[in-house]
Amino acid sequence: MVSVAEIRKAQRAEGPATVLAIGTATPANCVYQADYPDYYFRITNSEHMTELKEKFKRMCEKSMINKRYMHLTEEILKENPNVCAYMAPSLDARQDMVVVEVPKLGKEAAAKAIKEWGQPKSKITHLVFCTTSGVDMPGADYQLTKLLGLKPSVKRLMMYQQGCFAGGTVLRLAKDLAENNAGSRVLVVCSEITAVTFRGPSDTHLDSLVGQALFGDGAAAVIIGADPDTKIELPLFELVSAAQTILPDSEGAIDGHLREVGLTFHLLKDVPGLISKNIEKSLVEAFTPIGISDWNSLFWIAHPGGPAILDQVELKLGLKEEKLRATRHVLSEYGNMSSACVLFILDEMRKKSIEEGKGSTGEGLEWGVLFGFGPGLTVETVVLHSVSAPAAH
């Protein structure tokens, strides 16, 4: 008879969870930020609101976003006038879109990650799916399992409605799954479509307008496993530790509520100030055990909630300009894609690091940090260890 302790020991993996592949996808419809205010006020029949339009123009100019991708095309919006209104009952129309499109976009990203990984999809043992767009039963995790043709015994975890910090959350959960189950391979997918939050402008709800200037659609997928077989798998980053915390005095700073009118977005406090004031505490807790206190010695992946958050974090921590280069690049090219952003940045960083011959997947540095920020205010902190770049080819 085998003891429980022996079974438990055999179940555990040896090494740390490792990122083995990354894939990303966006809808085909690309929206340029310079053209967006005119388009947005026209499509929502709000051109008479000239002062508000000027305000929105300034928001778009300050956003540091060049372009975004959106499932919602002009044709779709013309067919769904209630989605264009500021507050009209429209949840059914929105749900009908996202329940189908979220798993589809997730499948595109996942297929790219699986292709890069190079292993049969039958080796995927766990699926973690995350979206803030739409809720359904069975969920987007089930739909993706069907779309990809994963085995029916894949162990699924569905995270709905978490918000912008959740790119960190999925890595934390995948790390625990991979390290606790020897031989497991976890497919992680974040798929976000703004059809749930899109709405017309109102001068009574400027924080909603901020969201209209920032949010974009995108999906990202990563494959995570401990003890990679380096003959057939190429490690990209190791996940060394992960933490989650609620910031003090931040209740109500970011809220989202699912209503008949869709998902409403509220920004109630000085979010950049709250994050920048508290971020060093998370860094100290994460890196003191490793013996690191120079934040410029790390490579950085931070959720780009908006440019003000990045500016204030940079200022508060005395970060060199190049530290947030990958983060700012993704914000500029895609906008704020909620949970998917940090995975896009991870992808951008390893690609650029290899292109530029940096010597490691983390811009030539050994240690890095990944931050998710979102409703709560919740902060996710993931400590990353890079892999020497030749191994990542």
From Swiss-Prot:
GO terms for molecular function: naringenin-chalcone synthase activity. One of its GO terms (biological process) is flavonoid biosynthetic process. Coiled coil: none annotated. The active site is at C164. It is an enzyme of class 2 (transferase). Its EC number is 2.3.1.74. InterPro entries: Chalcone/stilbene_synt_C, Chalcone/stilbene_synt_N, Chalcone/stilbene_synthase_AS, Polyketide_synthase_type-III, Thiolase-like. CDD domains: CHS_like (cd00831). Pfam families: Chal_sti_synt_C (PF02797), Chal_sti_synt_N (PF00195). Pathway: Secondary metabolite biosynthesis; flavonoid biosynthesis. Induction: By light. It catalyses: (E)-4-coumaroyl-CoA + 3 malonyl-CoA + 3 H(+) = 2',4,4',6'-tetrahydroxychalcone + 3 CO2 + 4 CoA. Keywords: Acyltransferase, Flavonoid biosynthesis, Transferase. It comes from the Eukaryota. Belongs to the thiolase-like superfamily. Chalcone/stilbene synthases family. PANTHER family: CHALCONE SYNTHASE, HYDROXYMETHYLGLUTARYL-COA SYNTHASE. The primary product of this enzyme is 4,2',4',6'-tetrahydroxychalcone (also termed naringenin-chalcone or chalcone) which can under specific conditions spontaneously isomerize into naringenin. This is Chalcone synthase. It comes from Vitis vinifera (Grape).
